[in-house]
UniProtKB/Swiss-Prot annotation:
GO terms for biological process: L-aspartate transmembrane transport. Pfam families: SDF. It comes from the Bacteria. Belongs to the dicarboxylate/amino acid:cation symporter (DAACS) (TC 2.A.23) family. The chain crosses the membrane at residues 19-39, 55-75, 90-110, 161-181, 199-219, 230-250, 343-363, 366-386. The gene is dctA. Keywords: Cell inner membrane, Cell membrane, Membrane, Symport, Transmembrane, Transmembrane helix, Transport. GO terms for molecular function: fumarate transmembrane transporter activity; malate:proton symporter activity; succinate transmembrane transporter activity. The lineage of its organism: Bacteria, Pseudomonadati, Pseudomonadota, Alphaproteobacteria, Hyphomicrobiales. It comes from Allorhizobium ampelinum (strain ATCC BAA-846 / DSM 112012 / S4). This is C4-dicarboxylate transport protein.
Amino acid sequence: MHISTTTAPQGGKLPFYRHLYFQVIVAIIGGILLGHFYPQTGEALKPLGDAFIKLVKMVIAPVIFLTVATGIAGMSDLKKVGRVAGKAMIYFLCFSTLALVVGMLVSNILQPGAGMHINPATLDGKAVASYAQQAHDSTITGFLMNIIPDTIVGAFAKGDILQVLFFSVLFGLALAMVGDLGKPVTNFLQALTAPVFKLVAILMKAAPIGAFGAMAFTIGKYGIGSIANLAFLIGTFYLTSLLFVLVVLGGVARYNGFSILALIRYIKEELLLVLGTSSSEAALPGLMAKMERAGCKRSVVGLVIPTGYSFNLDGTNIYMTLAALFIAQATDIQLSLGDQILLLLVAMLSSKGAAGITGAGFITLAATLSVVPSVPVAGMALILGIDRFMSECRALTNFIGNAVATVVVARWENELDQTQFRAAMAGELPEEIDVVAEPVPTAA
């Protein structure tokens, strides 16, 4: 089944002003202007962005459940579930670690914090105390135990991605194992997919409003001028993320037979939504629909993307090591090679608990610094004011990384329709594909 969130008029393509990406661009520009010239009004528009993100979160759990459960139920070889998950985790581990190393290398080369000579004792630790407390409350054991929900209803009520994914995988396996007895349930879930994704399409029409409110609030509250003093750090992070996407992920894409720029062009509407809301979670349903439409099998999409939202956060990983070394440089703390290796190892573990929501990267950084004694947690006060401006880049890089991972794993598993994928990358797919609920064959 393929889902489109765009409706084309009969007899031709959509006019440019009706494309979601154009509307979101206009909304972002409008939000920046309003927040800059009327900051108080901009701050007051925060509920618009918050409301849109809540609307999207409302449907994330059903989308994941339906996609994963029906995808696994239709697998004839249940061993493939473990194989897909295993390959995805290997991919995540390799490229998440590479992102951490890239951030560390760039920070050592460009030294964005050098010359600031900040005395850590003069920093206001209270400003980051809440983030440090949240980080302190998070442990690896607690994170792993939290994947198992207390109740099925609780997982859906909280909208916890990993808990919903955990139950969905088990339920899909159970459906496949009961064979024909589970076929009516599978067909019902398949039919239910159509209205749920139609609901997603309806909610996406509010994306420009959400992006406008979120951007107006960001500029109104923090101001464009607030980034001037730390512009070098922001520029370094954006440049590093761009190079990671174009060179590292671009190389992975080329090795697997597609262009990273073509993929970015294909998911441009979702990327603009991430840019406007600073949350990759806001575009999760759209990404899942787009990747399935591009020819990736539902079983792969359903396993890779939701898992990647916790285990494949390239942008967050670049930010963590880059920001940690920036704080050390700014406070004149010399980190030995051993200190940096310790920082890398701790970051490899703490980054796995980061979620795709705004501010999660900052909390994860606090978790890392609280374990590494050499770098003061209070130093995070230096970047607290500009973190919001780096959040967009983190979310965009995370999002592109998960899109690439989905294609790569699908190709490894021979679960990628090459003809359909090439058409998607060339922009040759029709603008509207009817949503049809087709029965999914169950495993015997």
